[in-house]
Amino acid sequence: MANIKSNEKRLRQDIKRNLNNKGQKTKLKTNVKKFNKEINLDNLSSVYSQADRLARKGIISLNRAKRLKSKNAVILHKSNTNSTAKKQ
């Protein structure tokens, strides 16, 4: 337990930020699940914007955001090529 006032304040700030960051990460996971359930460009753009925002704020690493965006773009591309192949 912190005995110094500045340490106590820092602890309070860390707890508040941790809760906020957890909520933001949960929103990202929800957007990814929504994209995986219904694969379309609108859901992909929401995943992109959310991942970019979290990476810019430092909540997730920049490399993790890039991997996430790349993985979901591949999924969208594969679903589009499969749907066009089925039509022919």
From Swiss-Prot:
GO terms for molecular function: rRNA binding; structural constituent of ribosome. One of its GO terms (cellular component) is ribosome. Residues 1-17 have a biased composition (Basic and acidic residues). The keyword Metal-binding does not apply. Gene3D superfamilies: Ribosomal protein S20. The keyword Transcription regulation does not apply. InterPro entries: Ribosomal_bS20, Ribosomal_bS20_sf. It comes from the Bacteria. One of its GO terms (biological process) is translation. Residues 1-25 are annotated as: Disordered. Keywords: Ribonucleoprotein, Ribosomal protein, RNA-binding, rRNA-binding. Binds directly to 16S ribosomal RNA. Belongs to the bacterial ribosomal protein bS20 family. This is Small ribosomal subunit protein bS20. It comes from Mycoplasma genitalium (strain ATCC 33530 / DSM 19775 / NCTC 10195 / G37) (Mycoplasmoides genitalium). The gene is rpsT.
